[in-house]
Amino acid sequence: MQQYHDALQHILDHGVETTDRTGTGTLSCFGMQQRYDLAEGFPLVTTKKLHLRSIIHELLWFLSGDTNIRYLKENGVSIWDEWADENGDLGPVYGYQWRKFPRLELAEGTLGDEPLYRAGTVDQISELLDMIRKSPDSRRLIVTAWNPGDVPDMALPPCHSLWQLRILGGKMHLQLYQRSADMFLGVPFNIASYALLLHMLAHVTGYEVGSFVHTMGDAHIYSNHMEQVKLQLSRSPKSLPQLRIARDVSSIFDFKYEDFEILGYDPDPVIKAPVAV
């Protein structure tokens, strides 16, 4: 994970001091990219311990289409607590957009000379899998969580907003575009989450895993994370762990938490930092 350390150092060296929505303040760089070859290991940061339970359960929650934190709370995951309302709802965030992206469908009849439409939805994950099977060479294997019409109703607009698959030479690759990247707290989770998603998609479609490409718009370190970042950079990255999927799963929607084993993960101690809300 030297790429991640290099990105942190680059922002410390070249970042611009900015204000932000949370009022915390950041050092920011615009337009950064890292590439992780999953053949070299599972990209889980080793210079601080990450909460694997949160990473896995959050991804399963996204894929289920759920947008209430009840499932997360039942499984010991609290990373969305600050944004949920009193009922645990977050509005039409990631899971909703991935599985029920709103669309208008042509209906029967007209209103005067105008056609009639009815409200429908697109299950982007199911359509993606169908397209992989029918057109594996497609350059349209894209899922988006950014829906301008729904952004005002979201507790937190999607930071990791769009991702694309590409299958080349029998390997499946995934590129994520992340509009806003909290480099210390959020990005290590995002890297692991989308690497896990790539493993899951490759598993159910029969491809080898290739690379995870992480493209970031605003990559920033919050002003109250500076000492934590410097502590992390004082530590040396260790060998990456390996991911093992414990059973043969045929549907992306059938994975369970127990299906994933992380082998050889020997991280340095946790480094705590406040979340900017």
UniProtKB/Swiss-Prot annotation:
It catalyses: dUMP + (6R)-5,10-methylene-5,6,7,8-tetrahydrofolate = 7,8-dihydrofolate + dTMP. It is found in: Cytoplasm. GO terms for biological process: dTMP biosynthetic process; dTTP biosynthetic process; methylation. Pfam families: Thymidylat_synt (PF00303). Its EC number is 2.1.1.45. GO terms for molecular function: thymidylate synthase activity. GO terms for cellular component: cytosol. Homodimer. Catalyzes the reductive methylation of 2'-deoxyuridine-5'-monophosphate (dUMP) to 2'-deoxythymidine-5'-monophosphate (dTMP) while utilizing 5,10-methylenetetrahydrofolate (mTHF) as the methyl donor and reductant in the reaction, yielding dihydrofolate (DHF) as a by-product. This enzymatic reaction provides an intracellular de novo source of dTMP, an essential precursor for DNA biosynthesis. This is Thymidylate synthase. It comes from Ruegeria sp. (strain TM1040).
